[in-house]
Design a protein with these regions (language model features):
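Glycine-rich flexible loops
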Residues: 20-267
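Hydrophobic h-region of N-terminal signal peptides that target proteins for export
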Residues: 11-19
């Protein structure tokens, strides 16, 4: 009972970001996030993003099954943590919504999730070269990114996270990290609950949707730069130290990036 209460308290604490946001506003922000991810090349026709419902952290919002660039607030559907639609009349959803529901179950501190197939990240999931932070905008990658091996779950699959069991296995691989790779598939990025105090850089409490979009984008950019550095340096790369990654990870919630990206998809 104490564990359940503690988890719920953590969930509710994570929603300081949403005090001024209604569910309708969060849906609109999610639609904008999807269009940004598409505009910046993080997703194409495939990929998805979600955010917890600020009024009910045991539910999350996700678009119906359509290309991210086409999403509007009217396309956003509410799901419970079993990834079942709240409304009996909900339109068809994504097959891989279990990625999101199972991560939210396992990680009460996670407020938003992005799953993406950016080509830049794929090589790091199929080789013995770990994805590590190479520049200051990717400090959130920490000491390296874990890789989800779907073969370890048992029966052969088509690589997709089609059920809660596969989603839970992915969540275990993610652990307490911000990013995990899926071998031969893509990656997942998560935004943790913002701190109660305002960010020391921006003076504002970070918005998890802005954070997770920034993490997905800069994971893609870091992978691209790391590949170039490996080729240029013959495999010898000067990565961020653990301290540098930790300190660089305390960015301003990518608010400046979000402001630019939002203006670009709003024109």
């Amino acid at each position: 009972m104490k564990t359940t209460i503690g988890r719920l308290a953590l969930l509710l604490a994570g929603f300081s970001f949403a005090h001024a946001q209604s569910a309708a506003q969060v849906k609109e922000e999610l639609a904008i996030a999807l269009r940004i991810l598409a505009h910046e090349g993080v997703v194409d026709a495939y990929g998805h993003a979600t955010v917890r419902n600020p009024s009910n952290p045991s539910h999350y919002f996700m678009s119906r099954n359509l290309p991210p660039a086409l999403a509007t607030a009217a396309d956003i559907v509410e799901y419970d943590l079993d990834s079942q639609p709240f409304s009996a009349n909900a339109p068809p959803g994504f097959t891989e919504r279990y990625i999101h529901g199972e991560i939210y179950k396992a990680r009460p501190d996670v407020m938003a999730v992005v799953h993406f197939h950016a080509p830049d990240v794929i090589p790091f999931g199929v080789t013995n070269v770990p994805l590590r932070p190479i520049f200051h905008m990717a400090g959130f990658l920490g000491g390296g990114v874990p890789i989800f091996e779907i073969r370890d779950t048992g029966a052969p699959t088509d690589m997709l996270i089609r059920n809660p069991q596969l989603g839970a296995a992915l969540a275990r691989t993610l652990g307490n990290n911000s990013v995990a790779l899926l071998r031969g598939h893509g990656a997942v990025a998560v935004a943790k609950a913002p701190p109660a105090a305002a960010n020391a850089i921006s003076g504002a409490v970070p918005n998890p949707l802005h954070v997770v979009v920034g993490e997905a984008y800069y994971t893609m950019i870091n992978a691209r730069l790391q590949m170039q550095a490996i080729q240029l340096g013959g495999g010898k790369v000067n990565y961020l130290s653990d301290d540098e990654a930790r300190m660089a990870g305390a960015q301003d919630g990518f608010e400046r990036s979000w402001t630019l990206w939002k203006s670009e998809v709003s024109r």
